[in-house]
Amino acid sequence: MCRIAGTPPRILPPLALMLLAALQQAPIKATCEDMLCKMGFPEDVHSAVVSRSVHGGQPLLNVRFQSCDENRKIYFGSSEPEDFRVGEDGVVYAERSFQLSAEPTEFVVSARDKETQEEWQMKVKLTPEPAFTGASEKDQKKIEDIIFPWQQYKDSSHLKRQKRDWVIPPINLPENSRGPFPQELVRIRSDRDKSLSLRYSVTGPGADQPPTGIFIINPISGQLSVTKPLDREQIASFHLRAHAVDVNGNQVENPIDIVINVIDMNDNRPEFLHQVWNGTVPEGSKPGTYVMTVTAIDADDPNAQNGMLRYRILSQAPSSPSPNMFTINNETGDIITVAAGLDREKVQQYTLIIQATDMEGNPTYGLSNTATAVITVTDVNDNPPEFTAMTFYGEVPENRVDVIVANLTVTDKDQPHTPAWNARYQMTGGDPTGQFTILTDPNSNDGLVTVVKPIDFETNRMFVLTVAAENQVPLAKGIQHPPQSTATVSITVIDVNESPYFVPNPKLVRQEEGLLAGSMLTTFTARDPDRYMQQTSLRYSKLSDPANWLKIDPVNGQITTTAVLDRESIYVQNNMYNATFLASDNGIPPMSGTGTLQIYLLDINDNAPQVNPKEATTCETLQPNAINITAVDPDIDPNAGPFAFELPDSPPSIKRNWTIVRISGDHAQLSLRIRFLEAGIYDVPIVITDSGNPHASSTSVLKVKVCQCDINGDCTDVDRIVGAGLGTGAIIAILLCIIILLILVLMFVVWMKRRDKERQAKQLLIDPEDDVRDNILKYDEEGGGEEDQDYDLSQLQQPDTVEPDAIKPVGIRRLDERPIHAEPQYPVRSAAPHPGDIGDFINEGLKAADNDPTAPPYDSLLVFDYEGSGSTAGSLSSLNSSSSGGEQDYDYLNDWGPRFKKLADMYGGGDD
């Protein structure tokens, strides 16, 4: 089913259904009538009008594709896949939600045959306007109530609500309404208003978002109203959301979308993009020649009559040779010629008054506007250029270039500064060597005869040139014109004093090095090209001589040496030495020229070879670690290598300790002859002889350092290692520092342990009333045994009663005593009989110790971790106190402070 942009199929109005039926029948009729089937899109451009607000998944339009074979698989695609998607049925969907701009949105829909890979394309234009804007006020009044899309139905014993399958149609509201305001539009309600007290509201641009206050709603009745006139050119449609909540603000219905389309009215005149339009047309153009296009725009809906424009020409000035020389396409604004006879020489410009009218050009109801079109008749080349004289004259000094020697003037009746007027000049004779060229002055159209190559007066004293002139474009066909215009240019060459020049330049001389100072080397002279001027004389001088080896005679140019020529000099590059000399005449003005003398120095055997490197290192034992040496000779072949290497006979220790072997023409190896050579530095003389004729030899001294080597043959010189590492004193200092550091650490640990013991001893002297800390003390250390082994067992008799302690002064009480306060009296427990009355002895000793501050234990740190080798006493499990077996009150333990809380809980904690 074909769907019109943005309108669901179930709510299409009758007008849309008729249009849809027409669209569906049109291609079928065409298919039946056509004899041949042509696959593809039926149109190149498909235009559609959609809402300005596009939602993701919204169907926009249906593209038609004509397929001649139903079995073919056609796949559709979009050039903007992020915004638009084309389904298999040709329906274009929006991929995401966005707002269309004021300008039409364009993209390309493509269709591809899966088998043949043939592809067709069609451009789609989306205009941001509502699909239907022509609904009448009668149609609007029919939409009285908008009910939230839910309906009730009975399910067994109770009612249920089900979402309706329909979409609320847009509300069409004409712009520029005169009211009265507020103007009621529609009533929004929920079918649950019978059982609940509801409150209605709308949100969105135009309601609670800018521009706010355009649409209001009665919260009780749901009546939606507009408060002021609307302007379609500012906002073409409003997208509102209606909400229904109960009196507590709880959502009762899902929000519904309400689209209000502003119907366009013809309230804007057409406006031309420019008030004055300029165009050109060549003279003599045939009827139907395109001239220009004028364009006007209308702010009203371009898809309705309000925005459909038509153009026409109101007047033409001048009216020669015909009052209707031009016509205009009433829809596109294209201006073309309709009559012949355009002649620039008679009429150079036409002025047309153009009118644009909307309502498809209806003169009664349409609004119109005018603009001016100025058409300039351009010139064609119907007049050739003509020289103003038959002969032109000029002169030029010799050896000058880029000099204008003559101006050629022409006349042309065509329009200045056009291709039909601009002249081009050609030389048809008199310049076989290309000494001249003719340029065109863009302002005056004159021909500028210019020298491009130097002219020698001694060769040519005068030139007679023949030139012709033509335009940049060829002459128009069918027009009679005179023959091409030509002229003669006579140019005289003026003689000037020219610079002398050396011959040859540069001059090459081959000479062996070692030429003594004062020797004649060569003669280097120059020539004066001025043969027709008064005889001049030349003088020579030296301009550049880097090594200062040469001098030149100022009259005859004879060059002699002032120093010995040395090929090995730093001023010689690649055997070549360069010097520059100057030749000057006495003309007016005086001129000079330079010449370069190149001396190629041939090598002689004047340098003896030397050893390289000058120092080497080897092991003190005979090992395969020979020293590689190289002979270096500044001379070149044949005065250089191959070289001969040998050791001198004196002193004898040289050949006794060393041996040398040549391994190539330039290299040799020096090695020990004996098994061991004491470490040290030795000067080894080596005699090297080159291959020159005569031979040149020299004795070079090689300093060899003999040292101890490791198993890899690398030198392990102890002095070098010590020099590179730490000395003995430094190592001893480091060790002493480490020992001192360890002693300090040990002393610190001992001091920490001693301080901990002192802290523990001080804890016993702290008054528990002043030092109340919830700490757990350890009392299971009993010392190393009893010191007094001589005791009377008969004294260990359990006392009948326990007397209360005497009250001691504050400050002499021990920390292990009970607190000083009146103690309750407890009944004496019956003591079990015990042989020897050990219990009495213990009680008496305990009482005496408690009452005597001088009796042990003293307030000092005692050691109780040694119990001796064994105890002679038997088991103490049968010892009884005077209170054994009886109930005692241990509440006094609670007065001892937090340290004895655990003990108090054990004895006085009640049932626990």
UniProtKB/Swiss-Prot annotation:
Disulfide bonds: none
Compartment(s) of residence: Cell membrane; Cell membrane, Sarcolemma; Cell junction; Cell surface
GO-annotated cellular components: adherens junction; apical part of cell; apical plasma membrane; apicolateral plasma membrane; basolateral plasma membrane; catenin complex; cell body; cell surface
Binding site for Ca(2+) 2: E175, E233, D264, M265, D267, D300
Binding sites annotated in the UniProt record for Ca(2+) 1: E175, D231, E233, D267
Compositional bias (Low complexity): 869-886
Span list, region Disordered: 869-890
Leader sequence segment: 1-28
UniProt-recorded Gene Ontology molecular function terms: alpha-catenin binding; beta-catenin binding; cadherin binding; calcium ion binding; extracellular matrix binding; gamma-catenin binding; identical protein binding; protein kinase binding
Membrane-side (Extracellular) residue stretches: 165-729
Record's bilayer topology term: Single-pass type I membrane protein
Keyword Signal (UniProt): yes
Propeptide: 29-164
Residue positions with a glycan: N278, N330, N407, N578, N628, N657
PROSITE patterns membership: CADHERIN_1 (PS00232), CADHERIN_2 (PS50268)
Protein residues bound to Ca(2+) 3: N266, N268, D298, N306, D358
Keyword set, alphabetical order: Calcium, Cell adhesion, Cell junction, Cell membrane, Cleavage on pair of basic residues, Glycoprotein, Membrane, Metal-binding, Repeat, Signal, Transmembrane, Transmembrane helix
Metal-binding recorded as keyword: yes
TM region(s), chain numbering: 730-752
Task of the protein: Calcium-dependent cell adhesion protein; preferentially mediates homotypic cell-cell adhesion. Cadherins may thus contribute to the sorting of heterogeneous cell types, and thereby play an important role during embryonic development. Required for proper neurite branching, and pre- and postsynaptic organization.
Notes on the domains: Three calcium ions are usually bound at the interface of each cadherin domain and rigidify the connections, imparting a strong curvature to the full-length ectodomain. Calcium-binding sites are occupied sequentially in the order of site 3, then site 2 and site 1.
PANTHER family assigned: CADHERIN-2, CADHERIN-23
Protein name: Cadherin-2
Source organism of the structure: Gallus gallus (Chicken)
